[in-house]
A protein has these predicted regions:
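Surface-exposed, active-site-proximal loop segments in enzymatic domains
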Residues: 19-25, 54-69, 94-112, 137-151, ...
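Active-site loop/lid in soluble adenylation, ligation, and acyl-transfer enzymes
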Residues: 45-57
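Histidine-acidic metal/acid-base catalytic patches
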Residues: 2-46, 119, 123-126, 131, ...
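Catalytic-core regions built around general acid/base machinery
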Residues: 67-82, 160, 164, 269
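Aromatic- and glycine-enriched glycan-recognition loops and surfaces
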Residues: 28-36, 61-75
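Substrate-binding cleft and catalytic face of glycoside hydrolase catalytic domains
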Residues: 81-100, 133-144, 179-182, 186
Length: 347
């Protein structure tokens, strides 16, 4: 019998924030970006999720040599803190050139900008000795369907994947699907779409998925089933665990904060599939409540990590013989009651 997985956790520096939202300004003092890395180990985290401009600020204004210099400096910072860069993601949704999309923009000049920015992100990942690029295809979609040729858009996405795989012969690409926001309807809305693109690529073994709980919920799907699908194909590069209270804007609530049973099932699928045993991180993408005072605010991170580990113990202490008995008898009423009682800690 294999030994239990010793999970490692990651988050991005943006998860320590000032609490601004579309309806109001900051409510907390800013905590300096460069000081956030010193918090990770104290909070129980070993991995750092990075946007390209988290790693190298203002990179569009820098030369390749300057980008390399800045990335190398961050590599030293992370090493000194005992941290591992989990991935680098090109932040392709802020620039004026990406208003109408990035790789699927109708403008050839805008597509060229997106490709140039992507190459810079890969260069940063190389400098950090980071093995993965995450593609959140944020603005790849439309507000009205007639705005783009969808077939051509998907062809362009596949061509971009192949170009990335050719640009770096070892980098992995993890596609992070989301069905909406900031576009009305996005291309590659689910992990099934992402894995289909992976298999169509020139080196599918290096193309995987990153599943965020809230994104799956926003697609009307169960996050644990999405994870199971990716795991069955050997294509779950990472996860962004959080929660979502209904079909609305992306909330990034604390993991388990809206649906504890759904959180349990995500942990169950990951644990039973051996996720993490090959070094994969358990990534969190959670926002502190706007009402939370302090600087820096980090309880949402430690609370979500703690809840994950509590649910791991719930999975490991399930009576598997009883579960098998209920399954064999097709007595799912009894199975459900057992699961609910187990989660509540009552007999």
């Amino acid at each position: 019998m294999s030994s239990p997985t010793n999970y490692r956790f990651s988050f991005g520096p943006w998860n320590i924030s000032e609490g601004a939202d579309p309806f109001g300004p900051n409510v907390r003092a800013a905590f300096p970006h460069e000081q956030k890395y010193a918090l990770y180990k104290k909070l129980g985290f070993d991995g750092v999720q990075l946007h390209d401009d988290d790693a190298v600020p203002n990179l569009d204004a820098l030369t390749p040599a300057q980008i390399q210099q800045n990335a190398t400096a961050l590599k030293t910072v992370l090493k000194n803190e005992g941290l591992t860069p989990e991935f680098v993601a090109p932040r392709l949704w802020f620039a004026e050139q990406t208003v109408d999309g990035c790789y699927t923009a109708n403008s050839a000049a805008d597509r060229a900008y997106a490709w140039d920015r992507t190459k810079k992100s890969i260069d940063i990942a190389r400098a950090l000795d980071c093995k993965a690029i995450v593609l959140w295809l944020s603005r790849e979609g439309t507000y009205i369907r007639e705005a783009k040729d969808a077939r051509l858009a998907y062809e362009r996405l596949l061509a971009t994947l192949n170009a990335m795989l050719d640009y770096d012969k070892s980098i992995e690409i993890w596609i992070e699907p989301k069905p909406n926001e900031p576009t009305d309807q996005a291309y590659v809305p689910t992990i099934g779409h992402a894995i289909a693109l992976a298999y169509a690529s020139s080196d599918h073994k290096r193309v995987k998925g990153l599943i965020e709980s809230a994104h799956a919920i926003l697609a009307g799907l169960d996050p644990s089933d999405e994870m199971a699908f990716a795991l069955a194909h050997g294509k779950l590069g990472s996860v962004h665990l959080n929660d979502q209270n209904g079909l609305k804007y992306d909330q990034d609530k604390n993991f388990g904060g809206a649906n504890l049973r759904a959180a349990f099932n995500q942990v169950r699928v990951l644990e039973e599939s051996g996720y993490g045993s090959n070094g994969e991180f358990v990534g969190l993408d959670v926002k502190a409540m706007r009402t939370q005072a302090g600087c820096p605010v980090t309880a949402h991170l430690t609370n979500s990590r703690s809840l994950f580990l509590t649910l791991v113990e719930k999975v490991r202490t399930m009576d598997q013989k009883l579960v098998a008995q209920y399954r064999d008898a097709r007595d799912y009423e009894a199975l459900e009651l057992y699961i609910l009682r187990h989660l509540m800690g009552v007999r």
